[in-house]
Amino acid sequence: MLGLPWKGGLSWALLLLLLGSQILLIYAWHFHEQRDCDEHNVMARYLPATVEFAVHTFNQQSKDYYAYRLGHILNSWKEQVESKTVFSMELLLGRTRCGKFEDDIDNCHFQESTELNNTFTCFFTISTRPWMTQFSLLNKTCLEGFH
């Protein structure tokens, strides 16, 4: 029995179509994984300096004699806006035993008290070009205590 001339070609075309879609799916998955990895690297590289700027700004604007330092990063994310990176973060800040104008507040112990006024939960939005050490505070909202 004679087969149709395109019958073998059709099965090859179908095979190529199926394999082609698998290759595209693998490429899309790899691209997504790479993008997630790049996003993680940017956060790991630039978030610490941005958090430091946020805490420094909080201390500069605070009327309290005592310095506050980072207790925990509660949440953070990054957005790209034109040529700037914008970090949004929710931080738990604790009052230390050191004055805010002392040299090494990073090593100051937290004040030990059950009073809520020893901590602040703050939401910061900071526009930055961290590779140029440029930071700009866009928003700061703080509430006393842990929320």
Curated annotation (Swiss-Prot):
InterPro entries: CST9-like, Cystatin_dom, Cystatin_sf. Pfam families: Cystatin (PF00031). Residues 1-28 form the signal peptide. Keywords: Disulfide bond, Glycoprotein, Protease inhibitor, Secreted, Signal, Thiol protease inhibitor. It is found in: Secreted. Specifically expressed in testis. The keyword Transferase does not apply. Its main location: secreted. One of its GO terms (cellular component) is extracellular space. GO terms for biological process: antimicrobial humoral response. Disulfide bonds join C98-C108, C122-C142. The keyword Glycoprotein applies. One of its GO terms (molecular function) is cysteine-type endopeptidase inhibitor activity. Belongs to the cystatin family. Lacks critical consensus sites important for cysteine protease inhibition. PANTHER family: CYSTATIN-9-LIKE (PTHR46945:SF1). This is Cystatin-9-like. It comes from Homo sapiens. The gene is CST9L.
